[in-house]
Amino acid sequence: MALRGCHRLEVIFKRCIASPVLHSQAGNRRSSQLAIKGVDPNSNGNSGQYQQNGEHKEKGWRRLVRFFVPFSLGAAVSAAIIQREDFTPTIAASKMTGRRRDFNFIADVVAGCADSVVYIEIKDTRHFDYFSGQPITASNGSGFIIEQNGLILTNAHVVINKPHTMVQVRLSDGRTFPATIEDVDQTSDLATLRIQVNNLSVMRLGKSSTLRSGEWVVALGSPLALSNTVTAGVISSTQRASQELGLRNRDINYLQTDAAITFGNSGGPLVNLDGEAIGVNSMKVTAGISFAIPIDYVKVFLERAAEKRKKGSAYKTGYPVKRYMGITMLTLTPDILFELKSRSQNMPNNLTHGVLVWKVIVGSPAHSGGLQPGDIVTHINKKEIKNSSDVYDALADNSKTLDIVILRGVKQMHVTITPEDP
């Protein structure tokens, strides 16, 4: 259709340029211009200067005709073509709507459960923004509402072990509320928050025991503080033991997925196609390898927490009393090292153990000391680090500062960190 329109324009332009009307108009205009000067247009006397000026003006007129006529006619012809012909898409709007309705199953899942996902901010009460005067954001994460009266589920590492801070929750509609930490299980990395609001949208909890490898799942949350973010993928494994991930004191078979779980996504829901939470987003090792806590394990935590609340006390296990460094880490097991080396050429071939830093809290001692996500800790105070337990032992030591040897890509570096007392 566009080619037909261009062909019509070309034909009309040629006819216009060859038209005697335009030439006669140009001649008449030339005569009138010479007449204004008081010169006979047919005179051949000593009027060379005027004749030269006339020829110059004639050339200028022709330039104007050649320049403006095609554009004017082009606009007119284009308008005529638009009136006569429809620029319809290849697929009719009604059919497109039907296909979108039939095949956009991810959008259907999100529409049914996104209202129950919240954005969590950890505010540093010691440092304030210069312009607004409000406490700066030290960290962020995600969570989801599990009771209409304001009970929210998230990861423990999102909200605890951060001194001099307060927790704020932003709902999907933009409203923000202060939150209190109610229940904590640091061993399983689960926690609940409470905000003083009622009649909230609640996330339905599914059954992780019925999951199969290859099932579609959707991860919702706030990666890198970008709230209301949706990523999708499949379940890569339903039985990834915590021992394979080097996580101490945890007897959990994690859900492995290739749905992107990035910093800030922690604590958000991993949802099946029925819109039910079947896991809590927990950690990412590298692109395409992320892990979530199975919802069946979460239900046990919630039941114990509810029993404690009925008795008038909060459910807190493994609550930290150690010094604070401000990182989230993962032990580099042989399986994880193999995956990292296969996906990155910057991993040293002789690296056999260490701890991967996959999140650094802004404003924390680790952040001030220069640690970055992706660094691999190999030594602390000249002691070899083989797993995350060694890092906890170093924090429990009485040393005022920690001299940490890290690998950043293929480069070995030293950073010095002064942990904060609890």
From Swiss-Prot:
InterPro entries: PDZ, PDZ_6, PDZ_sf, Peptidase_S1_PA, Peptidase_S1C
Location of the region described as Serine protease in the Swiss-Prot/TrEMBL record: 139-302
Active-site residues, Swiss-Prot/TrEMBL: H157, D189, S266
Entry EC number(s): 3.4.21.108
Topology in the lipid bilayer: Single-pass membrane protein
Pfam families: PDZ_6, Trypsin_2
Subcellular location: Mitochondrion intermembrane space; Mitochondrion membrane
Membrane spanning residue stretches: 64-82
Top-tier EC class: hydrolase
GO molecular function: serine-type endopeptidase activity
One GO CC term, this protein: mitochondrial membrane
This protein's UniProt keywords: Apoptosis, Hydrolase, Membrane, Mitochondrion, Protease, Serine protease, Transit peptide, Transmembrane, Transmembrane helix, Zymogen
Major localisation: mitochondrion
Sequence ranges assigned to domain PDZ in this UniProt record: 325-410
UniProt transit peptide range: 1-17
Keyword Transmembrane carried by entry: yes
UniProt-listed CDD domains: cpPDZ_HtrA-like (cd06785)
Propeptide residues, chain positions: 18-74
Record keyword Mitochondrion present: yes
UniProt region (Disordered), positions on chain: 33-55
Reactions the enzyme catalyzes: Cleavage of non-polar aliphatic amino-acids at the P1 position, with a preference for Val, Ile and Met. At the P2 and P3 positions, Arg is selected most strongly with a secondary preference for other hydrophilic residues
Disulfide bonds: none
Protein function: Serine protease that shows proteolytic activity against a non-specific substrate beta-casein. Promotes or induces cell death either by direct binding to and inhibition of BIRC proteins (also called inhibitor of apoptosis proteins, IAPs), leading to an increase in caspase activity, or by a BIRC inhibition-independent, caspase-independent and serine protease activity-dependent mechanism. Can antagonize antiapoptotic activity of th/Diap1 by directly inducing the degradation of th/Diap1.
Summary of subunit composition and partner proteins: Interacts with th/DIAP1 (via BIR 2 domain).
Membership in a protein family: Belongs to the peptidase S1C family.
Protein name as it appears in the record: Serine protease HTRA2, mitochondrial
